[in-house]
Amino acid sequence: MATRIEFHKHGGPEVLQAVEFTPADPAENEIQVENKAIGINFIDTYIRSGLYPPPSLPSGLGTEAAGIVSKVGSGVKHIKAGDRVVYAQSALGAYSSVHNIIADKAAILPAAISFEQAAASFLKGLTVYYLLRKTYEIKPDEQFLFHAAAGGVGLIACQWAKALGAKLIGTVGTAQKAQSALKAGAWQVINYREEDLVERLKEITGGKKVRVVYDSVGRDTWERSLDCLQRRGLMVSFGNSSGAVTGVNLGILNQKGSLYVTRPSLQGYITTREELTEASNELFSLIASGVIKVDVAEQQKYPLKDAQRAHEILESRATQGSSLLIP
């Protein structure tokens, strides 16, 4: 028997429950993975709450984990039983001790990277990859704004930006998070609880503002993010941690300087096995060389059955960096 987390209705963390099940054999194009570490991501809370409803209920949760391949479907040739793998784009159900996934959605994990490092960084790292390398290609010395710089995605973005020679200006909510972002490689930080975001950004940039803003916060920062952009600047809205942006008047983009807005997703940038290989190789190289460091605080590692508590703490904004479930 194996254990997985399910929910039968939408709601808060209390709807999550651990159930025992017998895993099915993998289909022809699938592999079965014994998960060793499972990534917890903010999008998981959107799915649980119903903001991004799953295809049906009851539903599993989670799309990211790292582990060992235990079984291989008859049509899979590039992965074998015993391989170490990581994945971030599975069907819902990664919050599980065993999970069947499409083989082309898994990447072979280099020996230099642990299961915990992989599960803590793969979805977030691939997200930073497409944001900084594809959605808008950040150049050396370029100044740009990145919200939630001390979160799981943010800390990887700080390190990746530094590796690119770029100048990430990060927003944070506490002095402790400011220190974390700066240590990771942020060029400047703005504490939005103590400083006026737009005015402080103007000070930092000598009044020029920035060409691109990366915003995973959503509703609370939408208009202020637009006000941080130069004429014809790009707003990259890639999350809704404060709630979804609704009722948008497109005329505001005209009024604030002929701005552009995009709402990208990982699936829009990494769909094929070739795209996954290109992205994961770049990410793994940065992690294995120590350019990107992935450390998960011990208090942010939870037994699989404690998924409720993990979600409560994540949504309280009390975490720094990544959190994991351990089967």
UniProtKB/Swiss-Prot annotation:
Under InterPro entries, the record lists: ADH-like_C, ADH-like_N, GroES-like_sf, NAD(P)-bd_dom_sf, PKS_ER, QOR-like, Quin_OxRdtase/zeta-crystal_CS
Cite the binding residues for NADP(+).
42-46, 130, 152-153, 173-177, 192, 216, 238-241, 264-266, 317
> Where does it sit, as one GO cellular component term?
cytosol
Keyword annotations: NADP, Oxidoreductase
Keyword NADP in annotation? yes
- Stored SMART domains: PKS_ER
Is NADP set as a keyword in this record? yes
EC top class named in words:
oxidoreductase
* Entries under CDD domains matching the protein: QOR2
Known EC number(s)? 1.6.5.5
Per its record, the protein catalyses: 2 a quinone + NADPH + H(+) = 2 a 1,4-benzosemiquinone + NADP(+)
Q: Which GO terms describe its molecular function?
A: mRNA 3'-UTR AU-rich region binding; NADPH binding; NADPH:quinone reductase activity; protein homodimerization activity; zinc ion binding
According to its UniProt record, which protein family does this protein belong to? Belongs to the zinc-containing alcohol dehydrogenase family. Quinone oxidoreductase subfamily.
Quaternary structure?
A: Homodimer.
Full protein name:
Quinone oxidoreductase 1
Question: Which gene name does the record give?
Answer: qorA
